[in-house]
Amino acid sequence: MKKIILVAGGTGGHFFPAVALGEELIKRGYEVHFITDLRCKQYIKQDMKVIFHILDLKRSGNIFLFLPRLSIAVLKAIKLLYNMKPSVTVGFGGYPVIAPMFAAIFLRVPIIIHEQNSYLGKVNKFFASFAKKIAISYAKIKNLPEFAKSKIVVTGGVVRENIRELKVIEMSSRGLTTGSKKSLIKALDSVVKPRNDKLFTIFIFGGSQGAKLFSELIPASIQILMQKQPSLELNIIQQAALDDQVKIKDIYSKLNITYAFAEFFDNMALQYKEADLVISRAGASTIEELTYIGLPAIFIPLPSAADNHQYYNAQLLEDEKTGWCLEQNNISAGKLADKILELISNPKILEDASQNLLKRRKEGHKLLSNLIEEVI
């Protein structure tokens, strides 16, 4: 049985798409090994069929500290790959892939890199000259070297199976018109039962680097929104830290808004299924999932994201009329409230955005697996 190594780490945005790819490759008869770092250890579940290996590489701004750490990690990776004898190594970008990719090059194992964002990251750009193929999610990608263009294959991103299994709901059947909200998520705590079946549901999540901001911004925006349109029937599903939930509950309760909170959503499919509109960061995996099911979003890109890639992701979607980009440095509760009200008041805008999203959807798990098989 041929062995394939996948390398991803740092955040769930890199981890979960790689797991989804691994599951597709296992179905095709390959033995899949996944090298990740300590930060992603928390995401590993017993029912995942890929074989995990933890190889941690701590970052440091001091080059004299980082190089010895990198050297040790590369030696460990060389030993690991030498014993495995893989047919190919696939890297998903970010500094956790550096050591395994160097090891693959040293052992002359073919490498493929996958860039999830609309801006080629530094690590992927470095390894582009060594890669057999470069899989990308966006046909229009920034920071791509001229020599790498011949290696490009547009595969789209890889979406988790439970998201792919979601039935795509037409936007015209959502929201304030005929959308039924009776099946409000039972898995979450702090749920207030819907008053009727015509609630407009907004799903808000920001990951570890967005939840705090959203816990302050969103309630303030909803207060303004309800002042402008008191007759709105809203349902809010929101990621929030426990410390913030009491304050937010008080605000939503006074506004007579249906709500549900969680610190972390284990099954995003459940929340997506309920939502009419998403407010989130603009990470690549989030965008791919929303694209796959045709669910429009207001994106607030993380300003500190490497190479400002989240801004480029969100701006590209806005240019394609598939989403809306509000920059964190320029946003206010009033601006966000106005945008939400505009979208709720004009269902056709949401419907058009949904259809535009579905037009750009790709079966990334299959296309990337096909590409890997071509290289082997």
From Swiss-Prot:
Gene Ontology cellular-component annotations: plasma membrane
Swiss-Prot/TrEMBL keywords: Cell cycle, Cell division, Cell inner membrane, Cell membrane, Cell shape, Cell wall biogenesis/degradation, Glycosyltransferase, Membrane, Peptidoglycan synthesis, Transferase
GO function terms (MF aspect): UDP-N-acetyl-D-glucosamine:N-acetylmuramoyl-L-alanyl-D-glutamyl-meso-2,6-diaminopimelyl-D-alanyl-D-alanine-diphosphoundecaprenol 4-beta-N-acetylglucosaminlytransferase activity; undecaprenyldiphospho-muramoylpentapeptide beta-N-acetylglucosaminyltransferase activity
Location relative to the cell: Cell inner membrane
Enzyme class, UniProt record, top EC level: transferase
Topological relation to the membrane, as annotated: Peripheral membrane protein
The enzyme's E.C. designation: 2.4.1.227
Record has Cell cycle as a keyword: yes
GO BP of this protein: carbohydrate metabolic process; cell division; cell wall organization; lipid glycosylation; peptidoglycan biosynthetic process; regulation of cell shape
UniProt keyword annotation of S-adenosyl-L-methionine present: no
Pathway note: Cell wall biogenesis; peptidoglycan biosynthesis
Membership in a protein family: Belongs to the glycosyltransferase 28 family. MurG subfamily.
Known role: Cell wall formation. Catalyzes the transfer of a GlcNAc subunit on undecaprenyl-pyrophosphoryl-MurNAc-pentapeptide (lipid intermediate I) to form undecaprenyl-pyrophosphoryl-MurNAc-(pentapeptide)GlcNAc (lipid intermediate II).
Record HAMAP family: MurG
Name under which the protein is recorded: UDP-N-acetylglucosamine--N-acetylmuramyl-(pentapeptide) pyrophosphoryl-undecaprenol N-acetylglucosamine transferase
Organism: Rickettsia conorii (strain ATCC VR-613 / Malish 7)
Name of encoding gene: murG
